[in-house]
Regions:
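Glycine/Thr-rich beta-alpha phosphate-binding loop at enzyme active sites
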Residues: 43-139, 174-192
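A cross-domain feature marking catalytic cores of carbohydrate-active enzymes
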Residues: 37-39, 97-99, 147, 169
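Structural preference for beta-strand elements that scaffold enzyme active sites
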Residues: 4-7, 32-36, 90-96, 140-144, ...
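Active-site beta->alpha loop and helix N-cap motifs at the rims of alpha/beta catalytic domains
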Residues: 1-16
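Extended, H/D-rich, highly charged conserved domains that either
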Residues: 15-21, 25, 34-38, 42-47, ...
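Glycine-rich beta-to-alpha transition loops that act as phosphate-gripper elements at the mouths
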Residues: 99-101, 141-154
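Single conserved hydrophobic/aromatic residue that forms the stacking wall/gate
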Residues: 217-230
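Glycine-rich phosphate-binding active-site loops on the catalytic face of alpha/beta enzymes
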Residues: 39, 158-182
């Protein structure tokens, strides 16, 4: 049915299990394999500071997912081993960045304790992950993207050598699937070439710019039913 698989790592999944599943897909099933990573790889302090700086200080979360999820010091050696394994098998190994981000339900948004953040607020976190991984692997690791991609940035991601690019949140906004016309026009203007590597400098610049991008800043809605003084 398919010669490529993406392994979505659930929050709290032990690194040993992630690696065993990926090795099985590569060695036994002989499929190109991507591992989908969680934004918690960045650490609590960075995530909190970045979101606060863009006006998302109302989004609440503590550090327990950051402590329980896959850690950077475990992830990087594992990814190097899996890339070497895939090279020996004549297959491709890469990462999909990133999964959604678990945050607390504080205003009765859902009948649960947690919900999952997606969309443009995820973009500065996911591009930072991409920049860190690109630098660690010298741009040689394939990166697939999901984390706030839309018509305003899809061309920049593609130009960095990051693809495939998937998106959902932007299609849930006014315009729906018709937004793909604008996205397609952006990509049609670019030349497609076989993967030659991720441009480390370009993705680092994209991640840095995302932390102060006006299009990503949250603008609070006016308080409903507020009295206006004339």
């Amino acid at each position: 049915v398919c010669n490529c698989a993406t392994l979505s790592t659930l929050h709290g999944c032990p690194p040993q299990e992630i690696e065993r599943i990926a090795r099985y897909l590569i060695e036994e099933k002989k499929v190109h394999t991507f591992i989908k990573c969680n934004p918690t790889l960045l650490g609590y302090e960075f995530a909190r500071k970045t979101l606060d700086g863009l006006g998302y200080d109302y989004i609440q979360f503590d550090d327990h997912h950051f402590r329980e999820d896959l850690q950077w010091e475990d992830a990087v050696p594992m990814f190097h081993r899996l890339q070497a394994l895939a090279d020996r098998e004549g297959l491709e190994f890469g990462l999909k960045l990133s999964n959604t981000f678990p945050v607390d339900v504080k205003a009765g948004e859902l009948p649960s304790e947690e919900m999952y953040m997606a969309g443009k607020s995820l973009f500065p976190l996911t591009t930072t992950m991409a920049a860190m991984m690109a630098k660690e692997f010298g741009g040689k690791l394939r990166l697939s993207y999901a984390g706030g991609a839309d018509a305003f940035n899809v061309d920049k991601l593609f130009s960095c050598g990051i693809w495939p690019i998937t998106m959902a949140t932007t299609e849930l906004k006014p315009g729906g699937y018709q937004r793909f016309t604008q996205i397609g026009d952006k990509l049609d203007a670019l030349d497609f070439k076989p993967f030659q590597g991720v441009d480390v400098t370009a993705v680092e610049a994209l991640a840095q710019a995302a932390r102060s991008d006006l299009s990503l800043i949250h603008i609070s809605e006016p308080t409903r039913h507020a009295q206006i003084s004339y």
